[in-house]
Amino acid sequence: MQPADCPRGLLPRPCRVLVLLNPRGGKGKALKLFQSRVRPLLEEAEVSFKLMLTERQNHARELVCAEELGHWDALAVMSGDGLMHEVVNGLMERPDWESAIQKPLCSLPGGSGNALAASLNYYAGHEQVTNEDLLINCTLLLCCRQLSPMNLLSLHTASGRQLYSVLSLSWGFVADVDLESEKYRSLGEIRFTVGTFFRLASLRIYQGQLAYLPVGKAASKIPASSLAQKGPANTYLVPLEEPVPPHWTVVPEQDFVLVLVLLHTHLSTEMFAAPMGRCEAGVMHLFYIRAGVSRAMLVRLFLAMQKGKHMDLDCPYLVHVPVVAFRLEPRNQRGVFSVDGELMVCEAVQGQVHPNYLWMVSGSSDSPSGRDSQRRPPPEEPI
């Protein structure tokens, strides 16, 4: 529990951190890197820690469900984005989820997908770096102890599943690359480059209905009771079996190359997907690419994305919209969804963003600017 005299938006000194580390993530060097790179910096900064190694998929989820969180000032996750996904969903499954999700989180890149860490590195004002340089930068952010509130995305599927995302949901090209590049995990993040070119060689079209609630029309809210669930109220969503509300935008095209919902700036350490910058409180980026785009243009887009210049190409097939909610209904079960890099069965899904819903170690204690007073304020103190 944070001392009463600790400034708002800061971790205390000394600080106690539970580190969850996946020793098999990425190239399998996370534990060695923690001992050689991370540990000395934490000890110098008076950050005491307990290291717990995950042994299987969803182990981190089980650990945070059962952990006595009051023993720790923060939870650090050293792996890829998938382990942070497990931790956040584990916190939201606890009986005390409302207080548990306020426990500050820290992303230490140690997997093959480190987009969240890359985004936090960008928010701190650092240049785009990868591998050990990114790990050191993120460790130093933890040593500096500054916190920022971040958005959370809640998702609801046709089969009744409810889950949460801290980074992204993708369907089509990006999700397929996530799935098909698993066999190249030992290559680290370069697996995504390899997977991208394999998928370009056999480009697929995905059919479905996409609808969204743009930021400018978000004033009209649905009664919270219309979508009953545990967790934060979904004030913009109606049940999936009902049509979307009339003030939503329904995309007329139904053939896509990809659909991407992104809460942060980076899709990987070298994919600066949202150069328009950090989302405001209660806003997320929706990107989609319509069918008809050439392979040559896709190559240009992905190469330009490394520097955040893809929007400068003015590709007529690429659309970006700031949104607060969305619904995606695939016409068939072809393909998969990827949520924070974790695979999810292909079925109708909808979601909405919850502003300033969790604390993360970042380079600034400033919160994203808000659009209106409807957003949830960050907690008075992280716990």
Curated annotation (Swiss-Prot):
UniProt KW Cell membrane keyword: yes
Compartments in which it is found: Cytoplasm; Nucleus; Cell membrane; Endosome membrane
Gene3D superfamilies according to UniProt: 2.60.200.40, Probable inorganic polyphosphate/atp-NAD kinase, domain 1 (3.40.50.10330)
Record PTM Phosphoserine, positions in chain: S225
Disulfide feature: none
Gene Ontology biological-process entries: blood vessel development; brain development; calcium-mediated signaling; cell population proliferation; cellular response to growth factor stimulus; cellular response to hydrogen peroxide; cellular response to phorbol 13-acetate 12-myristate; cellular response to starvation
UniProt binding sites for substrate: S79, G80, D81, G82, D178
Chain segments carrying region Disordered: 363-383
Predominant subcellular localization, coarse grouping: cytoplasm
One family name in Pfam for this protein: DAGK_cat
Catalytic residues in the record: D81
Key words, A-Z: ATP-binding, Calmodulin-binding, Cell membrane, Coated pit, Cytoplasm, Endosome, Kinase, Lipid metabolism, Membrane, Nucleotide-binding, Nucleus, Phosphoprotein, Synapse, Transferase
Record-linked PANTHER family: SPHINGOSINE KINASE (PTHR12358), SPHINGOSINE KINASE 1 (PTHR12358:SF47)
Function of the molecule: Catalyzes the phosphorylation of sphingosine to form sphingosine 1-phosphate (SPP), a lipid mediator with both intra- and extracellular functions. Also acts on D-erythro-sphingosine and to a lesser extent sphinganine, but not other lipids, such as D,L-threo-dihydrosphingosine, N,N-dimethylsphingosine, diacylglycerol, ceramide, or phosphatidylinositol. In contrast to proapoptotic SPHK2, has a negative effect on intracellular ceramide levels, enhances cell growth and inhibits apoptosis. Involved in the regulation of inflammatory response and neuroinflammation. Has serine acetyltransferase activity on PTGS2/COX2 in an acetyl-CoA dependent manner. The acetyltransferase activity increases in presence of the kinase substrate, sphingosine. During neuroinflammation, through PTGS2 acetylation, promotes neuronal secretion of specialized preresolving mediators (SPMs), especially 15-R-lipoxin A4, which results in an increase of phagocytic microglia.
Name by which UniProt lists this protein: Sphingosine kinase 1
Name of encoding gene: Sphk1
